[in-house]
UniProtKB/Swiss-Prot annotation:
NCBIfam families given in the database record: ispD
Family listed: Belongs to the IspD/TarI cytidylyltransferase family. IspD subfamily.
Pfam families (alphabetical): IspD
Designated name of the protein: 2-C-methyl-D-erythritol 4-phosphate cytidylyltransferase
Biological process according to GO: isopentenyl diphosphate biosynthetic process, methylerythritol 4-phosphate pathway
């Protein structure tokens, strides 16, 4: 069993929607509802903790009722950064040995990816899902190519990411003490010298970040319905 943590306090400035991007609609259903439904199907998911902006609590609670989200969702105060939100949520992750941390704006995560991440977390203590990078990657400085990066070893990391609660707490506390801000939770675990397992993600498991992503998400959903 695991608890799902969703840091949902961000404002999604790159989307330019003027509101939390998780409230934007894909096929007339909010992004966050699509995401929650993916985990509703997983019996191993004991509960869900969402770190939110307190002023958005009434709307989140309304969505839970309107779309009949049956799993228990606990809303807690988010932090200034995503990392702070996850740390806050960890304080409430009781009665389970493992947590999965997932971006609320990844509505197309599959049950297979969820299960694989959990299995790897149970094996290694920490795990991520990722897909091989398909584009050529170049290092650029001041508008000029400095280096072409070897692509064969590069992976684009997604969520969910899985952790033992004790390990992730240790990693977050260490980062907090050193004022270290990581790009994801796995980077905090790497920083304390622990191994992170990797499983195959999915190219459909996109993060809806820009208006273009929203169009792609609409297309994905149409394909799924066929």
């Amino acid at each position: 069993m695991y608890t799902l943590i969703i840091p949902a306090a961000g404002q999604g400035k790159r989307m330019g929607a003027g509101k939390n991007k998780l409230f934007l609609l894909i096929d007339e259903v909010p992004i966050i509802v699509h995401t929650l439904r993916a985990f509703e199907k997983d019996k191993a998911c004991k509960s869900i903790i969402m770190a939110i902006n307190e002023e958005e609590r009434p709307y989140f609670e309304e969505l839970m009722q309107k779309y009949q989200i049956e799993k228990h969702v606990q809303f807690i105060q988010g932090g200034a950064e995503r990392q702070d939100s996850v740390y806050n949520a960890l304080q409430y992750a009781s009665g389970v040995e493992y947590v999965l941390v997932h971006d609320g704006a990844r509505p197309f995560v599959t049950n297979k990816v969820i299960r694989d991440v959990l299995t790897a977390a149970e094996k290694y203590g920490a795990s991520i899902c990722a897909v091989p990078v398909k584009d050529t990657v170049k290092k650029v400085e001041q508008g000029v190519v400095v280096e072409t990066v070897e692509r064969s070893q590069l992976n684009a990391v997604q969520t969910p990411q899985g952790f033992s609660v004790s390990l992730l707490l240790e990693a977050h506390r260490s980062a907090k003490q050193s004022c270290f801000l990581g790009t994801d939770d796995a980077s905090l675990v790497e920083r304390v010298g622990k191994q992170v397992g990797v499983v195959e993600g999915s190219y459909y498991n996109i993060k809806v970040t820009t208006p273009e992503d929203l169009l792609i998400a609409e297309s994905f959903l149409r394909v799924q319905k066929k």
